[in-house]
Amino acid sequence: GNTRTRENVIRRQLRIFPGDVYNQERIARSYREVMMLNFFANAAPNVLPVSEDKVDISFNVEEKPAGQANANMGYTQSIGMTGGGGLALPNFRGRGQSLSISFSANANQGSSYSYNYNPNRSKYRSLSISFTDPMVNDTKNLLGGSLFYQYRGGGSMYYSPINYTIAGANVMWGRIFKWPDDYFRGTWQFQMTRRINDADSPEELQQYAGGLEQSDGISFSQTIRRDSRDHPEFSTIGSHFSFKSMISGWILGGQENFQKHILNLEWYTPTFWKFVLMNSMKIGFV
């Protein structure tokens, strides 16, 4: 039933293979893994006896729309009218890869003769693009990266009057674990950012940016998570645990020195009929 998703993207999620001993638990796990891709409305397994000691197992998948396009508008007193859009393709080219692009800007981009121009409001624009391959060459390795850019002009309304530009990039590697079980996976990310500050006077630069015309942030983060939910969107059973630690500066270099640690716990308990109790806890410190 896969009309868009490539065959290998589905097969690499399966936990039972030709020649294996029949195992209901592994069939159920295969169904769960295919559904967690979030590319299919259904992936029901079908067991067909072919002899006294053999059966054929097929997974009848039903593709559903996975990509998203969005447009947005907003208004704030400091920036004014903003607009933007984005494109998210979680199943890019049917290979299970993820590609996303987003941008936004405000209307205060023209000269003082522009209808939308207000000298008290900040100019603003941002752009980001990211790509992730969750199973490179059908292995248990994840590779990804992103580029991002943001500019905000100075304005006297509520916020800092200096102009600043932030640009950066990151690369990420991940791996599915075998221990304690294969619900665990880890990702490691290295990120570099640069902020350029532009002020009208040294006094403003000192007051709002600590006297720095340019600052670099170099960080490394690790995320360990375990996800045993039965569905990525409307989970009815299972749990999701993640612990992320980030360190910036110090031995890595740059002018931004901090540590950040976040623990997130979610677990789902079926109650009665179609009602599910979801409990969550989130703890973090910087």
Language model features with spans:
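Gram-negative/organellar outer-membrane beta-barrel architecture
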Residues: 6, 20-233, 239-242
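Active-site-adjacent structural elements in folded domains
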Residues: 226-229, 247-252
